[in-house]
């Protein structure tokens, strides 16, 4: 896929890598011996940007050279874009997710005015993707359940805009809407779709969906946490640390189809550090020949920052 937008001089992640060097020096023990585990540079596919300053600190500490950022409980499309303008390592996505109380009524009445609003945002050329769109999302802390069909008028309109502007779309769709998601992917084979958390699907469904839909990308945020607060089987870890060998095998068989993410939301420094540390722990378990694709290459290519 050709780059979607012109690249910038800072897109190569040089500032982020410089921060990694500084972090590595600061991490040296007092006696000057190097730490055992080096920080692995990665591009974070999933951040709810509520606190740009905290996000910057976390990225510098944990090796994130880039991050896809979008709405949070305390942010909007406008504030996300403002942050990205001052922090070029942030990759802004525009969203009209029904999980937001401001947008939900429009989804319930299939209001095209909301799609026109998204069209205007994308026409600015400032956003590198669409999402996160929580079309079907089980209840979570602070957010009511959403259950809109991926084949409905709103998602269809979003996908048509993604096609128009040649942008990827990040969707949160649970396994209860798997059939409609598959049909949507077939209807828009030219639109890259990032599946947030991979829909928390088990291994065999992940494999099937990836084999059947070449435009689908399986995003692993919250799947690498030591423990998921909603369900213990949501993670891909067998003991809170080690990735199941079968998952590693699938990822290494299809390295061009997986993305890493933190699902950061800046609730507290401690909770966010856990999320970033889990990405580092996961990446250390992937064989080096394919690690770079999963860690950074796939995402940067999708958003037009790499060939």
Question: How should these model regions be labeled?
Answer:
Residues 4, 8, 14, 28, ...:
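Mid-to-C-terminal alpha-helical segments outside catalytic/metal-binding sites
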Residues 43-47, 67-69, 92-95, 129-131, ...:
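Hydrophobic faces of well-ordered beta-strands that scaffold small-molecule active sites
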Residues 47-87:
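N-terminal carbohydrate-binding/catalytic regions of secreted carbohydrate-active enzymes
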Residues 48, 72-73, 95-101, 133-136, ...:
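Active-site beta-loop-alpha junctions enriched in small/polar residues
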Residues 55-58, 79-83, 114-121, 154-158, ...:
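A general structural detector for well-ordered alpha-helical segments in enzyme core domains, enriched
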Residues 74-168, 225:
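Active-site gating/metal-coordination segments in enzymes
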Residues 145-259:
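Catalytic pocket-lining loop regions of alpha/beta-barrel enzymes
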């Amino acid at each position: 896929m050709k780059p979607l937008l012109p690249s910038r001089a800072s897109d190569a992640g040089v500032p982020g890598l410089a921060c990694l060097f500084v972090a590595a020096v600061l991490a040296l023990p007092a006696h000057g011996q190097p730490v055992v585990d080096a920080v692995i540079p990665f591009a974070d596919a999933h951040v709810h940007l509520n606190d740009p300053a905290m996000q910057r600190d976390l990225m510098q500490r944990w090796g994130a050279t880039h991050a896809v950022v979008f709405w949070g409980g305390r942010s909007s499309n406008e504030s996300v874009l403002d942050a990205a303008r001052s922090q070029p390592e942030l990759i802004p996505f525009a969203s009209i997710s029904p999980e937001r109380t401001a947008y939900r009524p429009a989804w319930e009445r299939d209001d095209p005015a909301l799609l026109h609003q998204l069209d205007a945002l994308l026409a600015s050329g400032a956003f590198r993707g669409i999402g996160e769109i929580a079309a079907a999302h089980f209840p979570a802390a602070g957010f009511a359940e959403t259950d809109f069909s991926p084949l409905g008028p709103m998602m269809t309109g979003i996908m048509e805009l993604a096609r128009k502007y040649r942008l990827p779309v990040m969707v949160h769709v649970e396994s209860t809407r798997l059939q409609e998601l598959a049909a949507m992917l077939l209807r828009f084979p030219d639109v890259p779709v990032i599946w947030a958390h991979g829909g928390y699907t088990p291994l065999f469904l992940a494999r099937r969906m990836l084999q059947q839909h070449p435009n689908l990308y399986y995003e692993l945020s919250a799947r690498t946490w030591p423990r998921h607060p909603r369900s213990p089987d949501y993670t891909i870890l067998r003991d809170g640390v080690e990735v199941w060998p079968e998952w590693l095998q699938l990822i290494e068989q299809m390295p061009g189809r997986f993305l890493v993410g933190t699902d950061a939301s800046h609730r507290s420094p401690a909770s966010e550090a856990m999320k970033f540390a889990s990405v580092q722990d996961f990446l250390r378990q992937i064989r080096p020949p394919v690690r770079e694709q999963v860690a950074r290459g796939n995402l940067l290519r999708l958003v037009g920052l790499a060939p």
